[in-house]
Amino acid sequence: MKRTDEKRLETLSPFEVKNTLIDLAQHSHEKTMINAGRGNPNWVATAPREAFFQLGMFALEESKSNFSGYEGFGGMGVQQDISLRFLQFCEKYEDQEGVQFLIEAFQFITDQYQVDGDALIYEWVEGILGNNYPVPDRMLKYSELIARKYIEQEMAGSQPLPAGKFDLFAVEGGTAAMVYIFNTLKSNRLLNPGDTIAIGAPIFTPYIEMPELEDYALNKVEIMADEASAWQIPDSELEKLNDPSVKAFFLVNPSNPASVRLSDETLYKIAEVANRRPDLILLTDDVYGTFA
């Protein structure tokens, strides 16, 4: 793209830029772009899916080998030496797509985090077969370990990690997480009907709609980002958070639909508010955090 065209794009809003790039991409296969800035991206990552399906085939082999008396039925996995059988399976099908990914994932986790190989593969097999209630029910042990390390890497970057440990809860998706959070805040009397919450706007539509539902009946105060300031939140808007009647602040970062991350300066200002108001609940939706 010519620099003159880039300069022209710099004058457009994020929505106009997105639409312009999509229009460019549709003119030629050579210009096809990966678009992750929407609810349903126009692409999928094939490597992990290939590995997923190969893992499923191994899990079925395990199941069939332990319950061979009935055609069409399988049994529970056996943990003892299951990692050895897994590696034998990978050696047998090493030319299949996804197998090398599985081997590398297994070796990385067992080497980097000193995880017992049999315990790891057994969890994978039981999980992909779906033949048991998960323990713990919020997220499987090694799945949580892996996801936590990934989140620490992507969300903390070069910054020091916060003190202490945080737990992860695996859910069906971002909107489902919102429902669970609203229900949890209500059930624990942290938010009650008639309370006021602040919402960083513009924002993903359900954040606007859900507080108005009869189940929650919450009042909303919008903390409006300024398009003229590259979608940062002005000090005058952040001042609204100093109102003690505001019980919580819901924020999407990077933003949706603007697709812009908050600057470090803005984040520090929010942190200052949180330090002044330890009673203020901060809820951040970081679904696009890995793109920041």
What does each model-found stretch correspond to?
Residues M1-E104:
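Conserved N-terminal helix/loop that builds the PLP phosphate-binding region
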Residues D285-D286:
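Walker B catalytic acidic pair
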Residues G72-D279, G289-F291:
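Conserved core of the PLP fold type I
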